């Protein structure tokens, strides 16, 4: 059996063998600490009755750990230069398939059906996400309604803080709401920048997202709900009124009527967006949708 990939020596050996040079544009940072990999698979609760989608396998360090613990692993890799390396490093595992595709452009549901021998098994998504595409990837997976029980991501600590934030904190914002509306979010542990090659400028964190049985609040129009939440954080230091009136100019001539209606459901327009929790944003968006629809 070959040595684990996730060590400084083995990673350097693989990179030299293939003359691989990191592409900064792809945000490539490879893990060189196998203990972190074990903690990731433990956090994700991977078992032999679990299928896993991995995004951005790199040279296969996390993929290898997933292959040891999961039923099957399907990994999306955008960098064609890594395909022969992955063929080599993962040659001992017959339960891994690498798909050369950009997950942002892929039909992930179709890949699940085509690539897994038992697509009916519980699905989990695990990834060491490049910093520059973290948010688009997570939001795509949520909006495409990929049937994953959970998603476990290693990402920039600042982004993990934003995803797992609570109201009235600096990190709380529209990203928090976009994810926590559908998923329970737990920041599992911090990953120091020293366990990557090359070493990034900031620490990372592993976040575990578990799908809720139902969205956290009932909204009449999800698209409008997210439009309202984004508008409410457009300028964080401004009040709800200032941000919403800027987004929806039709509110301006009816300000007093709006204040009265929102006060009746416990929402004061002099508050800032960061003070509202998700159920309050749901009440706000449902009210605004009806209010704006009135002639």
Swiss-Prot record:
Keywords: Cytoplasm, Methyltransferase, RNA-binding, rRNA processing, S-adenosyl-L-methionine, Transferase. S-adenosyl-L-methionine binds at residues 29, 31, 56, 77, 102, 128. GO terms for molecular function: 16S rRNA (adenine(1518)-N(6)/adenine(1519)-N(6))-dimethyltransferase activity; RNA binding. The keyword ATP-binding does not apply. InterPro entries: KsgA/Erm, rRNA_Ade_diMease-like_C, rRNA_Ade_Mease_Trfase_CS, rRNA_Ade_methylase_Trfase_N, rRNA_adenine_dimethylase, SAM-dependent_MTases_sf. Signal peptide: none annotated. Transmembrane segments: none annotated. It is found in: Cytoplasm. Its EC number is 2.1.1.182. It catalyses: adenosine(1518)/adenosine(1519) in 16S rRNA + 4 S-adenosyl-L-methionine = N(6)-dimethyladenosine(1518)/N(6)-dimethyladenosine(1519) in 16S rRNA + 4 S-adenosyl-L-homocysteine + 4 H(+). PROSITE patterns: RRNA_A_DIMETH, SAM_RNA_A_N6_MT. One of its GO terms (cellular component) is cytosol. The keyword Transferase applies. NCBIfam families: ksgA (TIGR00755). Belongs to the class I-like SAM-binding methyltransferase superfamily. rRNA adenine N(6)-methyltransferase family. RsmA subfamily. Specifically dimethylates two adjacent adenosines (A1518 and A1519) in the loop of a conserved hairpin near the 3'-end of 16S rRNA in the 30S particle. May play a critical role in biogenesis of 30S subunits. This is Ribosomal RNA small subunit methyltransferase A. The lineage of its organism: Bacteria, Bacillati, Bacillota, Bacilli, Bacillales. The gene is rsmA.
């Amino acid at each position: 059996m070959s040595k684990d990939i996730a060590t400084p020596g083995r990673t350097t050996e693989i990179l030299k063998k293939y003359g691989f040079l990191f592409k900064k544009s792809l945000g490539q940072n490879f893990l060189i600490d196998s203990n972190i990999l074990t903690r990731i698979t433990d956090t994700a609760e991977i078992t032999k009755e679990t299928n896993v989608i991995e995004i951005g396998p790199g040279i296969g360090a996390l993929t290898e750990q997933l292959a040891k613990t999961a039923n099957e692993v399907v990994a999306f890799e955008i960098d064609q230069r890594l395909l022969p390396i992955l063929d080599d490093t993962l040659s001992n595992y017959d339960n891994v398939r690498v798909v050369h595709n950009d997950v942002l452009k892929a039909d992930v549901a179709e890949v699940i059906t085509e690539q897994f021998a038992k697509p009916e098994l519980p699905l989990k998504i695990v990834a060491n996400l490049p910093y520059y595409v973290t948010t688009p990837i997570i939001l795509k997976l949520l909006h495409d309604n990929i049937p994953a029980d959970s998603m476990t991501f290693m990402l920039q600590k600042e982004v993990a803080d934003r995803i797992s934030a609570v109201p009235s904190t600096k990190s709380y914002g529209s990203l928090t709401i976009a994810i926590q509306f559908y998923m329970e979010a737990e920041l599992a542990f911090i990953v120091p920048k020293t366990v990557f090659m090359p070493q990034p400028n900031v620490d990372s964190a592993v976040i575990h997202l578990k799908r809720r049985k139902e969205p956290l609040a009932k909204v009449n129009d999800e698209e409008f709900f997210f439009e309202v939440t984004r508008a409410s954080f457009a300028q964080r230091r401004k009040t709800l009124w200032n941000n919403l009136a800027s987004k929806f100019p039709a509110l301006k001539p009816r300000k007093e009527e709006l204040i009265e209606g929102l006060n009746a459901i416990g929402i004061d327009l002099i508050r800032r967006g960061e003070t509202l929790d998700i159920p309050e944003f749901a009440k706000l968006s449902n009210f605004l949708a009806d209010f704006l629809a009135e002639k």
